[in-house]
């Protein structure tokens, strides 16, 4: 293990429109090439579309989508005596959130609507209703962990 000190967590400010830290993290993950204003317009545009389509509070629906995508358990590789085992481990809360955000954005980018706003709003609505690619990714992760439950005694 490294004896150096860990990098300090950076302070992030809540987003200006909703005052939500998670939306800011989501925005930062959507951002490409440092273009924050573009990412901001994409995320806010998607939340506006969600509000129009679902006729409900977009922030609550956003958090519901994140909760539905976040994995509770995942597998990690562990080498034991020449064999590599996929060992199921619990996911820390910070990692759960980071994975959920990453999976939602990747699933949205893989959709075939025309604009990113439409793709993101569609994926968020699907995830809030337990459908879509991001939820499928979470199910696959859980299925993998369940299949390798026999190796759970190799936990570290």
From Swiss-Prot:
Any single biological process term in GO: translation
PROSITE patterns registered for this protein in UniProt: RIBOSOMAL_S7
UniProt keyword terms in alphabetical order: Ribonucleoprotein, Ribosomal protein, RNA-binding, rRNA-binding, tRNA-binding
Cellular component annotations (GO), alphabetically ordered: small ribosomal subunit
Signal sequence residues: none
SUPFAM superfamilies, sorted: Ribosomal protein S7
Any one Gene Ontology molecular-function term assigned to this protein's record: tRNA binding
Domain of life: Bacteria
InterPro entries assigned to the protein according to its UniProt record, in alphabetical order: Ribosomal_uS7 (IPR000235), Ribosomal_uS7_bac/org-type (IPR005717), Ribosomal_uS7_CS (IPR020606), Ribosomal_uS7_dom (IPR023798), Ribosomal_uS7_dom_sf (IPR036823)
UniProt subunit comment: Part of the 30S ribosomal subunit. Contacts proteins S9 and S11.
Function: One of the primary rRNA binding proteins, it binds directly to 16S rRNA where it nucleates assembly of the head domain of the 30S subunit. Is located at the subunit interface close to the decoding center, probably blocks exit of the E-site tRNA.
Family, per entry: Belongs to the universal ribosomal protein uS7 family.
Record protein name field: Small ribosomal subunit protein uS7
Organism name: Brucella anthropi (strain ATCC 49188 / DSM 6882 / CCUG 24695 / JCM 21032 / LMG 3331 / NBRC 15819 / NCTC 12168 / Alc 37) (Ochrobactrum anthropi)
């Amino acid at each position: 293990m490294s004896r150096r000190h860990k990098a300090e967590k950076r302070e992030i400010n809540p987003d200006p429109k909703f005052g939500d830290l998670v939306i800011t993290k989501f925005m930062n993950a959507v951002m490409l090439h440092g273009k924050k204003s573009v990412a901001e317009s994409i995320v806010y545009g998607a939340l506006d579309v969600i509000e129009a389509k679902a006729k409900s509070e977009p922030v609550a629906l956003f958090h519901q989508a994140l909760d539905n995508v976040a994995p509770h358990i995942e597998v990690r590789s562990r080498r034991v005596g020449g064999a590599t085992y996929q060992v199921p481990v619990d996911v820390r809360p910070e990692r759960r959130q980071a994975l959920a955000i990453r999976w939602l954005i990747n699933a949205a980018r893989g959709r075939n609507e025309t604009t990113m706003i439409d793709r993101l709003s569609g994926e968020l609505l699907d995830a809030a209703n337990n459908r879509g690619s991001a939820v499928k990714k979470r199910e696959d992760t859980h299925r993998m962990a369940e299949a390798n439950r026999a190796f759970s005694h190799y936990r570290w």
